[in-house]
């Protein structure tokens, strides 16, 4: 009998073999500028962003509920898109050290802007969503965001992914969304 014939096939649901995750795609529109950028991204401009958020169960993605899901897709949409709509959609993302942009945006009435603890690059936006937003809005659903992809264009994206235990995350400086409805 050959060695191949004596090997046992792994069980269909062996957690050492199968890891389950789900990805929810979200879309929003926002403007930004990149502080100290050497080219045209230093100007105020906007994008139709797409965000892909991948989540696994807190158990590592090896278990599902009685329906067979990690979590219902609609819960990811409700929580994450709700946050995006409230904070970033149709607003400007401004780096907290960009005094010129902050002064300019405050002159426009009404206005909506979100102050970030770092330059609002696609990389930093993905990082912020992964490290700050997802743990706060998804934490009680029994899932952990493992990866966030922020698409600025159909051809260009940035990826932030967890490489360690989610409990090791440190929260960056507090950020704030500011909406001024005065006319």
Segments (PLM) and residue ranges:
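Charge-rich, low-complexity N-terminal segments
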Residues: 2-183
